[in-house]
């Protein structure tokens, strides 16, 4: 089974059902080298006394690593962690790693809840969006994605009167990406289906690069309009400008990588031919306009000459 086929077919689901509220986490994605000190920020605006930090590895359940019942109260959770936390203010609960290691690679989720009892963890917890942390021994393994858009098949269009564009992002590491579709300059969500998670291109390798596929389905009529523009945009979260880089290729910093397609009419009338037609029509119009102007000048000259002759004959 090919890598691209795996990307088309793969679906990966997280088991945790999380409630998002006014919980803010920064950064959303972070890739760093071994030994760096990092702080993951978490804040909430609901005035909750209880706050929590969880760690979740891919495909695994949440593990509580730290919690707090209020200002200056911090406790360790049920999972041994080399991180530390502080609670100087009610709304603020940062988590710090003094010396990051590859084993710290994971997703870190911050949550809060109302205080209804110190010993109970059954209160409704509100979660932030999470921070995806990747710690690497060598930053040369970081690669941005290559992105391609594949046009709909004629068979689908003729049988269903629908058109599905496929976007494929390949060759990126780590899996810190967000994919979106844009039509005529505006982001769209209707008709979009994106894989829940990126897939490893070589599942047997720990440092395998990733791929991600997404589909945008529109009506055949909409696709067959050459004026419609489709763009697949992949936001890649890579290195920062401050990270040291000694490789002979471009530094894989945080960046946007895109691919695009134009609508294609069913009679072979492509966006290129449409634009060429518009250009030809514009030139023809200018030629005709020029001829009309020249004709008007000639007519005016003839009228003037006739008036002069008439005046001379009267004289």
Curated annotation (Swiss-Prot):
Does Disulfide bond show up as a keyword for this record? Answer: yes
Q: Name one GO cellular component term.
A: plasma membrane
Choose any GO biological process term that the UniProt entry carries and state it: detection of tumor cell
| TM spans (from-to) | 282-304
Q: What PROSITE patterns would the database entry show?
A: IG_LIKE
Which residues face the membrane's Cytoplasmic side?
305-315
Taxonomically, which superkingdom? Eukaryota
GO-annotated molecular function: signaling receptor activity
Gene3D superfamilies reported for this sequence: Immunoglobulins
List every stretch annotated Connecting peptide: 267-281
Q: Which SMART domains match?
A: IG, IGc1
InterPro entries registered for this protein in UniProt? Ig-like_dom (IPR007110), Ig-like_dom_sf (IPR036179), Ig-like_fold (IPR013783), Ig_C1-set (IPR003597), Ig_sub (IPR003599), Ig_V-set (IPR013106), TCR_beta_variable (IPR050413)
Q: Give me the ranges of the annotated region CDR2.
A: 68-73
Report, as the record phrases it, the tissue specificity of this protein.
Answer: Expressed in MR1-restricted CD8-positive T cells.
Region (T cell receptor beta constant 2) residue spans: 138-315
Key word Transferase present: no
Task: State the disulfide connectivity.
Answer: 42-110, 167-232
**Which residue numbers delimit the Ig-like C1-type domain?**
145-254
Residues of the region (CDR3) are 110-127
- All copies of the Ig-like V-type domain together span 22-114
Instruction: From the UniProt annotation, give the residues forming the signal peptide.
Output: 1-21
Question: Its function?
Answer: The beta chain of TRAV38-2DV8*01J31*01C*01/TRBV25-1*01J2S3*01C2*01 alpha-beta T cell receptor (TR) clonotype that displays pan-cancer cell recognition via the invariant MR1 molecule. On CD8-positive T cell clone MC.7.G5, likely recognizes tumor-specific or -associated metabolite(s) essential for cancer cell survival, triggering killing of many cancer cell types including lung, melanoma, leukemia, colon, breast, prostate, bone and ovarian cancer cells. Mediates cancer cell cytotoxicity in an HLA-independent manner. Has no reactivity to healthy cells even stressed or infected by bacteria.
Q: What is known of its domains?
A: The complementarity-determining region CDR1 confers specificity to the metabolite antigen. The complementarity-determining region CDR2 confers specificity to the metabolite antigen.
Q: What is this protein called?
A: T cell receptor beta chain MC.7.G5
Organism, scientific name = Homo sapiens
């Amino acid at each position: 089974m090919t890598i691209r086929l795996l990307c088309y077919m793969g679906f990966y689901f997280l088991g945790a059902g999380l409630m998002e509220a006014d919980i803010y986490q920064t950064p959303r994605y972070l890739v760093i080298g071994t030994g760096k000190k990092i702080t993951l920020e978490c804040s909430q605006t609901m005035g909750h006394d209880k706050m929590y930090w969880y760690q979740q590895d891919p495909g695994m359940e949440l593990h509580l690593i730290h919690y707090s019942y209020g200002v200056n109260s911090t406790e360790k959770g049920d999972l041994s962690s080399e991180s530390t936390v502080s609670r100087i203010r009610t709304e603020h609960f940062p988590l710090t790693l003094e010396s990051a290691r590859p084993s710290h690679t994971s997703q870190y989720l911050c949550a809060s809840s109302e205080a209804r009892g110190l010993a109970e963890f059954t209160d409704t917890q509100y979660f932030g969006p999470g921070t995806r942390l990747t710690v690497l021994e060598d930053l040369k393994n970081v690669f941005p994605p290559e992105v391609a858009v594949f046009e709909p098949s004629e068979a689908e269009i003729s049988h269903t009167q629908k058109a599905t564009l496929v976007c494929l992002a390949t060759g990126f590491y780590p899996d810190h990406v967000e994919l979106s579709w844009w039509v005529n300059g505006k982001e769209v969500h209707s008709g979009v289906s994106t894989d829940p998670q990126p897939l490893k291109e070589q599942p047997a390798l720990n440092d395998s690069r990733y791929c991600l596929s997404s589909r945008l389905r529109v009506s055949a009529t909409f696709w067959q309009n050459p004026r419609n523009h489709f763009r697949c945009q992949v936001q890649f979260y890579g290195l920062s400008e401050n990270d040291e880089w000694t490789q002979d290729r471009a530094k894989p910093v945080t960046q946007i990588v895109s691919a695009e397609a134009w609508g294609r009419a069913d009679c072979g009338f492509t966006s290129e031919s449409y634009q060429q037609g518009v250009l030809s029509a514009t030139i023809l119009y200018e030629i005709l306009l020029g001829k009309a102007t020249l004709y008007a000048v000639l007519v005016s000259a003839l009228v003037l000459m006739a008036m002069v002759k008439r005046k001379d004959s009267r004289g």
